[in-house]
A protein has these predicted regions:
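Secondary-shell segments that build the walls of catalytic and ion/ligand-binding clefts
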Residues: 214-283
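A glycine-rich phosphate/pyrophosphate-binding beta-strand-loop-alpha-helix module
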Residues: 112, 116, 120-160
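General beta-strand structural signal in soluble alpha/beta enzymes
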Residues: 100-102, 129-134, 155-159, 184, ...
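Phosphate/diphosphate-binding glycine-rich loops and adjacent basic-rich segments that engage nucleotide
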Residues: 165-239
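Short, Lys/Arg-enriched N-terminal segments with co-localized hydrophobic residues
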Residues: 1-19
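Active-site cofactor/substrate anionic-group-binding motifs, chiefly glycine-
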Residues: 66-119
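Catalytic-core signal marking the mid-to-C-terminal active-site face
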Residues: 23-24, 29, 270, 275, ...
Length: 374
């Protein structure tokens, strides 16, 4: 099925914990993830790396990609569509670039290796670009751009996914959620942008499906090409690979810029599967694993001037945006990454909200693996 496609909260806004959630200490949750991945058969440091990506999603409030994803990975490891013992391999390399084959290893491990390689190259030459083919779902795109930011570098991270987005004027899903992440050093928080190029992701459709509520108009079109707010119908048809799908960022047609989201999604596809010579969308449905491709680029702002000066300029600009005139009834203007970093501060202190359904899944995984639960 296609349940595993990257999904994000609306506008990448951290979900506020509700009374239905249990707060689990970040330390406890991380320790559980590490135990689980070691028991699945990963080496200790690999288990810690996978846990770090999932924890970052939960801390930033992008819960569709945290503990909630563990059951999906657990099933894929059992099915063999994630290869436990594979290691990503460098196929071609120059001082500023590399092409890697993931051999269907856990996407988080391959992606972290590819971004580390880009970071090393950027430190030596000023710039590093790596592309990956034959990978699997890698979690949140923004994790990898943040890795570079922590080293004082600016960075891009992108991935393709299975077909879910229809082209402008089309009714057949030909593109993925194709997220695009960019991070630039700044204070007190980096500029951390991570967004799908679809209006919404499958996750949002799933939420409306579970709640039995109609979706807002303008998210999806059905097999006839008509706008559709019936979540159960669209959820089923996307999972079946029927005609219809989620609209590009900007929505239907060209009036509100839908062709721009469509163009951005093709750009991500060009930089991932085309450049890495991996599987392009329509081919991704059948065969082994995910056939996901990724793109990473890290560069050193110091190539262009004093890095602390550039960082200060970025910080000042973001502050000016936050200080600018608000519309009536809105107390704050946020900059990308601000809500995520505020969520992280809260969750490190007060624990990570975990939904009851997810807690039940974690208990099931613990029982199956014979490890201590959360």
């Amino acid at each position: 099925g296609m349940k595993h496609f990257p999904c994000r909260n609306l506008g990448n806004t951290p979900r506020k914990g509700t009374s239905m959630d249990t707060r689990v200490s970040a330390q406890q949750l991380r320790a559980f993830m590490e135990r689980a991945y070691e028991k699945e058969g990963f080496e200790k440091e690999d288990a810690a790396q996978i846990a770090d990506v999932l924890m970052q999603a939960d801390l930033f409030g992008i819960e569709s990609h945290g503990a909630q994803r563990m059951m999906y990975y657990h099933q894929n490891i059992k099915k063999g569509s994630i290869n436990l013992h594979a290691k990503a391999e460098i196929i071609r390399e120059t001082p500023v670039s590399a092409l890697l084959d993931g051999h269907f290893a856990m996407g988080h491990l391959t992606a972290a290796k590819a971004m580390k390689l880009a970071i090393d190259k950027a430190k030596k030459t000023g710039i590093g670009m790596t592309v990956v083919r034959n990978s699997t779902h890698y979690g949140i795109a923004g994790y990898y751009s943040l890795m570079a930011e922590k080293e004082g570098l600016a960075a891009f991270s992108m991935t393709n996914t299975g077909p879910i987005m229809v082209p402008t004027f089309g009714r057949e899903a030909m593109l993925g959620t194709n997220p695009l992440a960019f991070c630039m050093p700044a204070d007190p928080y980096p500029f951390w942008f991570d967004a799908s190029t679809t209006v919404v992701t499958l996750g949002e459709v799933e939420v409306y499906n579970k709640r039995g509520k109609p979706m807002p108009e303008g998210w999806t079109i059905d097999g006839e090409g008509k706008t559709c707010s019936d979540a159960p119908k669209m959820n089923a048809s996307i999972l079946n690979g029927d005609l219809g799908g989620i609209l590009p960022l900007g929505g239907e047609g060209e009036l509100n810029g839908g062709h721009k989201g469509y163009g951005l999604a093709i750009m991500v596809e060009a930089l991932t599967s085309v450049l890495a010579q991996g599987m392009v969308f329509p081919e991704m449905c059948g065969g082994h694993g995910d056939h996901t491709s990724h793109f990473f680029m890290a560069f050193d702002p110091a190539m262009f001037g004093d890095p602390s000066e550039i960082r200060a300029r970025m910080s000042g600009y973001l502050q000016a945006l936050r200080d600018s005139e608000k519309i009536p009834g809105c107390a704050r203007i946020y900059t990308p990454g601000e809500k995520a970093h505020e969520a992280q501060a809260d969750r490190l202190k007060n624990g990570v909200p975990v939904e009851e359904k997810t807690l039940a899944e974690l208990r099931e995984i613990a029982a199956e693996l014979g490890i201590e639960g959360v």
